[in-house]
Amino acid sequence: KEGNAIKKEADITPLRPADVKLLKNYPTVKLTKGAVLYSDFPNSKIDAIAPELEGMTAFCLNAENQRQEGTAIEFTSDDAVNLLVGYFRDDQKKYAKAPKLETDASANDYGQAEPKLTNAIRIKGMPLANVHSYHFPAGTHKLLLPKGYTLVLGFTDQSVTPRNAALAGAEETMDWMFY
């Protein structure tokens, strides 16, 4: 579309992974179609992914541990970074709740309240996920994510341009307007 800056997928370049030192031994995987992000769900492979996320260094976590204990990410960075976290578009208890200012005063402590990429990742057998960006200055940090399944999609030193990655079908996109 002319005038309104709607990017075509061909114009979208992948985000650059940032250099961070992880303070725990988290298993990682390169984000690409077919990758597995849950060690205990080997058949839950990525079916589709927003082009911005292609090649990021994601974490391969244990979903049941996330559900029981939540997820803690500890890291050090020499520069400001954004940690990308995917929240599934489903309100079942097994999925972590996305940050919402209406119900959680800390929901924007890291600039994460609004999703940056909606309908951005589709995993076999799971709902679509939206991507939120948590911003951290240089230094040592510990992020505690809520209990439930989330996707830890990696660190970047670039900002994420908000958009609908449109991996949903037409009906799902309409549903999203009323979500």
Task: Describe the residue ranges of each PLM region.
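Activation corresponds to long, low-complexity, non-globular regions
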Residues: K1-L23, F136, L144-G148, F155-Y179
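Glycan-recognition and processing domains
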Residues: D11-Q66, A168-Y179
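Contiguous ligand/interfacial binding patches
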Residues: A96-N164
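A short beta-strand element within beta-rich, extracytoplasmic domains
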Residues: D79-D91
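Intrinsic-disorder/low-complexity loop/linker signature
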Residues: G3-N4, N65, K93, G125
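Residue-level detector of intrinsically disordered, flexible termini
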Residues: N4, E9, P17, D47-I49, ...
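Extracellular and analogous surface-interaction loops
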Residues: N62-N65, E69-N82, H132-H141
